[in-house]
């Protein structure tokens, strides 16, 4: 549910457009797009509307999140009404989390700040998705999976139950993780192997 009638969306690419759709689905009446340009400043005199960061790149999203937070803006979550979220799941409040249409988050899963859960992704029971990670369209984490911070799970990738993926790792599109990966890396294929 929208907290203000207007929302700032930082990022005006295709990802920004889908964030606008989710914001309007939540009841925001107007989305004000902001994007990079030389000398951009967040003035304290700007109206304090809700704020969302629509940047797909994890590292850039994290840096902008810190900058905007320091300037007193409230960074909200955008959660599409079609998402299915267990009452026992933990989604950090006011943490810049994006939950797209038809996402499923099951019992006692935890979603940390700055996470993107893209369309139709599935986060099963007791999973943890670390800060500023991005779970792409149709990606699935089976029960009790631990995804580190700043990770990227490619489109239609899959992580089998009880496995973990180290911080700053990438699981390629269509890949299936079948064993723990405790050191960061890029993993592709079925079964997923380090590149």
Swiss-Prot record:
GO terms for biological process: protein N-linked glycosylation via asparagine. Substrate binds at residues 13-15, 35-36, 56. Acetyl-CoA binds at residues 134, 155, 173. Changing residue 124 to A: Reduction in catalytic activity. Pathway: Protein modification; protein glycosylation. The record marks 126 as: Increases basicity of active site His. It comes from the Bacteria. Its EC number is 2.3.1.203. Coiled coil: none annotated. Acetyltransferase that modifies the UDP-4-amino-sugar to form UDP-N,N'-diacetylbacillosamine in the N-linked protein glycosylation pathway. Belongs to the transferase hexapeptide repeat family. This is UDP-N-acetylbacillosamine N-acetyltransferase. It comes from Campylobacter jejuni subsp. jejuni serotype O:2 (strain ATCC 700819 / NCTC 11168).
